[in-house]
């Protein structure tokens, strides 16, 4: 009797990803960060070009503080030119949609199998990021400074993409000196948003600037309580400007510094507890 030959079929490497239950989520995560970075950069180009031609839509009689709302960058009345004039707004929205996509996947993975409380969500940096993105998406007014933190964050995630998608939750992502500088820039860019919103409120740039400033400061207060890089950035600023503070206010200044120190210690303690019971 002839022996039967058992045919062993090799798995197609292209079909390997189909067996990954998280393949779709990883794809959404990658697309989200790409949208944020690409459309954020494209919007930034249009934004700074608009800044360079400020003299065309701002009156010198009002020290360039008053904006001519009837001015249009594209003067043609053709329908396709009208659509083109909306391109900065579309790019701005698409960059924020990318934030919704990537952060939603990250939060879903962080809380899978769990039932997070409101306290858990309010202490989550990813939830803060989503809240701020919703504020910019629905609050009106587009600005480079508002999406700059998201572009930096997406750049960091995409450069570490292969490691993040394949590493276990317990593994820490190695940070290079360049990554630390980018995180430092990210923290300061979030503080820059407060300054930009304050100027918009003082100059009455939009009718909602004041409300957005109050809401953003409220969310940033949460970040200051739970985000280590935000705490480090604020503490560095407090130390830098301490020498300019009058002596009679030094005690109050020290109280603020002690508060930041306390929050940093609490974060270290929480991290140690999580590592211990993980």
Curated annotation (Swiss-Prot):
Species name: Saccharomyces cerevisiae (strain ATCC 204508 / S288c)
Transmembrane domains' residue ranges: 35-55, 130-150, 181-201, 206-222
Keyword list, A-Z: Cell membrane, Membrane, Transmembrane, Transmembrane helix
Cytoplasmic side: 1-34, 151-180, 223-278
Recorded GO CC terms: cell periphery; endoplasmic reticulum; plasma membrane
Membrane topology type: Multi-pass membrane protein
Side Extracellular, residues: 56-129, 202-205
Family matches, as InterPro entries: PER33/POM33_regulator (IPR051645)
Upper classification of the organism: Eukaryota, Fungi, Dikarya, Ascomycota, Saccharomycotina
Predominant localisation class: membrane
A Gene Ontology biological process term: membrane organization
Record's protein name: Uncharacterized membrane protein YGR026W
Compartments reported by the entry: Cell membrane
């Amino acid at each position: 009797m002839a022996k039967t030959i058992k045919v062993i079929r090799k798995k197609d490497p292209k079909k390997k990803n189909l067996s990954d239950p998280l393949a779709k989520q990883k794809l959404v995560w990658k697309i989200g960060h790409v949208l944020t970075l690409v459309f954020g950069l494209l919007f930034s180009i249009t934004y700074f070009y608009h800044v360079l031609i400020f003299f065309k839509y701002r009156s010198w009689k009002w020290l360039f503080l008053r904006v001519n709302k009837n001015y249009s960058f594209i003067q043609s009345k053709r329908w396709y030119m009208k659509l083109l004039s909306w391109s900065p707004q579309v790019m701005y929205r698409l960059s924020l949609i990318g934030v919704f996509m990537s952060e939603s996947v990250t939060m879903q993975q962080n809380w899978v199998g769990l039932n997070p409380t409101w306290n858990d969500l309010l202490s989550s940096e990813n939830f803060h990021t989503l809240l701020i993105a919703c504020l910019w998406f629905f609050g009106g007014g587009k600005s480079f400074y508002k999406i700059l933190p998201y572009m930096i964050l997406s750049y960091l995630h995409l450069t570490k993409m292969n490691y993040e998608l394949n590493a276990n939750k317990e593994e820490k992502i190695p940070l290079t000196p360049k990554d630390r500088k980018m995180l430092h820039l990210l923290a300061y860019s979030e503080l820059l948003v407060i300054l930009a919103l304050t100027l918009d409120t003082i100059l009455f740039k939009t009718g909602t600037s004041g409300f957005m400033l109050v809401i953003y400061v409220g969310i940033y207060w949460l970040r200051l309580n739970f985000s280590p890089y935000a705490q480090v950035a604020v503490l560095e600023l407090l130390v830098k400007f301490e020498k300019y503070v009058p002596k009679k206010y030094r005690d109050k200044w020290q109280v603020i510094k002690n508060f930041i120190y306390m929050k940093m210690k609490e974060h270290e303690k929480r991290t140690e507890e999580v590592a211990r019971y993980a």
